[in-house]
Amino acid sequence: MAAPAVKSASTPKKATAQFLWEAKTKSGESKKGEMEAMDVEAVNARLKSLGLNPVKVRKKSMLDGDITIPGFGGVEGKDILVFTRQFATMIDAGLPLVQCLDILASQMDNPSFKKVLFAIKSKVEQGSTFADALKEHPKVFDELYVQLCAAGEVGGILDAILNRLAAYREKNEKLKSKVKSAMTYPIIVILVAIGVTAVLLLKVTPVFEKMFADFGSELPGPTQMIVNFSHMAQEYFFHVAGSIVAVVMSFTWSYRQPRGRKFWDKVFLFMPVFGPVLRKVAVARFTRTLGTMISSGVPILDALDVTAKTAGNRTVEDAIIYVRGKIAEGKNIAGPLAETKVFPSMVVQMIGVGEATGAMDTMLNKIADFYDDEVDAAINSLTAMIEPVLMVFLGGVVGGFLIGMYLPIFSLAGAIQ
């Protein structure tokens, strides 16, 4: 007869919580941070084991979290870039990791980033690795950052890795800034044109129409056309505005769905005018990310995993995942890259040469530098092409309206003479 089952321990494992603490060192210096523990007693015991005298310990509440409005008060790319540069310099100078984090957190102006850095410092003080502490803040430090720091810690070259990361982020921020500025200008001009047209049709035209009605004469064709457009705009304004909002919301919803994002990312990548610029940006980002990771000692399969996640375009991401699968099967990188038909043949050939000569990281970084310049040239060319078109469009809208509105006045003046 089987023995009765032994009853499992009746007391479940107690859940941990986040605690905020303040303490003093033996020299009287004040310290503060955040710690995960079972209770206040556990925090006090841990602080004493670190040579600190606890002053105040309390459980972290929801009110202690960062309350931020999207686009305001968050951690920006330039904040991370400056932190990485300074951190690399301090590590290179031989300062202990915890001291570096303490100094940088204390000097940080951004309150959100300050809290993150103090939390990371607290984790490291508790015995966590720097990379594991970073991993708990994925909205600030992406997987690329974490993986490279992990490689730097294992290899004892964290300062060199941080310098590479800083260089990578600096070039990446410049690339993003260029693309953003290129896209922002035409959008602003188009929005201004729409706003001006709306004001002219909804506010200005009715005033002129009332004045023309007093003349009692028939309106010229162009003027009548503008008046008809004004009537339509007034009658269907809310219908049009509602339709625009519905289209924007539908697109946003569609883009957030996996299939929708896959479709739209492919459309963006191969659409006229902007498509070639976006493809160059994708190549620059892919080669820069992969080159930085390989030169830092990250295995090729892990590097491709991270590169796929940071691609920024689903079509490019799927292509990188396909290439990774083929490499896992034992194939080289150039063949599968060519099969995706996403990357230019010149890029594929150069990567193939780099792989054959054992200098793929160097070749990838050279390709990235080349495509950074290509993006510059493409954006300058695009701006030079779009600028006069938009100016002519805006001038045509305003000029056409002015001519249409003043034609009856000129006709009336001619009749009086």
Curated annotation (Swiss-Prot):
Localization, UniProt: Cell inner membrane
Predominant location: membrane
Membrane-topology annotation of the record: Multi-pass membrane protein
Short name of any one Pfam family annotated for the protein: T2SSF
Job of this protein: Essential inner membrane component of the type IV pilus (T4P) that plays a role in surface and host cell adhesion, colonization, biofilm maturation, virulence, and twitching, a form of surface-associated motility facilitated by cycles of extension, adhesion, and retraction of T4P fibers. Controls both pilus assembly and disassembly and plays an important role in PilB localization to the complex and ATPase activity.
Subunit structure: Homotetramer. Interacts with PilB.
PANTHER family, sorted: GENERAL SECRETION PATHWAY PROTEIN, PROTEIN TRANSPORT PROTEIN HOFC HOMOLOG
Name of the protein this chain belongs to: Type IV pilus assembly protein PilC
The organism's taxonomic lineage, starting at the top: Bacteria, Pseudomonadati, Myxococcota, Myxococcia, Myxococcales
